[in-house]
């Protein structure tokens, strides 16, 4: 009996290792998008790795193998929920396009755009109404499309031409 349980545990571990070998890279990229850390050079994304390891540990604890549903969905769900719980503790990302977004906006945008999770599934996953997910996603996309406010000379400014004229002063030549 104990031999059968040991064999089952080894099989479970091998199935999980195969899953991580196949999906680990994409899940790590998702974690780096959520934390806003750069994905290069390797080792520059310590928070994303910690987030992924914690999510994978929980996934392994709930692991039923490929027969218990989609293991990628299970891991992605755990990654998203763990980030949502810890989102306030994550530092704001520095220097990337997602640094202007709140943790909730990053989470919704990553799930909807990068992971291509439907609006209803995203809402169910996060425990939010569908309208709220739609509004958060639209706000995040608008924030990414808007020119940066901290743009220096030669870069776009969020104030546009009117802001440039105002900075030069009234009556100044364009």
Language model region names:
Residues 24, 41, 115-116:
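Flexible coil/turn residues that form the inter-helical turn or adjacent wing/linker of helix-turn-helix
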Residues 100-121:
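Short amphipathic alpha helix immediately N-terminal
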Residues 24, 28-32, 45, 49-89, ...:
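Σ70-family region 2.3-2.4 aromatic/basic alpha-helix that recognizes the −10 promoter
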Residues 48, 122, 133-134:
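Helix-turn-helix DNA-binding helix
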Residues 90-101, 124, 129, 144:
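Short amphipathic alpha-helical boundary/capping segments
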Residues 24, 28, 98, 105-106, ...:
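C-terminal flanking helix
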Residues 1-35, 46:
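A short, charge-rich alpha-helical start-of-domain segment used by transcription regulators
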Residues 126-163, 171-173:
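DNA-recognition helix of helix-turn-helix
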């Amino acid at each position: 009996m104990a031999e059968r349980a040991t064999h089952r545990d080894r099989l479970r571990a091998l199935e999980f290792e195969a899953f991580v070998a196949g999906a680990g890279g994409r899940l790590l990229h998702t974690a780096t998008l959520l934390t806003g850390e750069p994905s290069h050079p390797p080792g520059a994304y310590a928070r994303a790795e910690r987030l992924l390891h914690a999510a994978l540990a929980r996934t392994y604890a709930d692991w039923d193998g490929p027969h218990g549903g989609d293991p990628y969905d299970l891991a992605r769900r755990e990654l998203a929920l763990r980030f949502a719980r810890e989102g306030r503790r994550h530092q704001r990302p520095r220097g990337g396009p997602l640094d202007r977004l709140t943790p909730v906006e990053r989470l919704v945008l990553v799930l909807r755009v990068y992971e291509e999770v439907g609006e209803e599934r995203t809402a169910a996953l996060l425990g939010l109404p569908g309208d709220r997910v739609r509004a958060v996603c639209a706000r995040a996309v608008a924030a990414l499309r808007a020119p940066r406010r901290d743009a220096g000379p030669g870069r776009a400014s969020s104030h546009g031409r009117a802001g440039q004229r105002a900075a030069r002063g009234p009556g100044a030549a364009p």
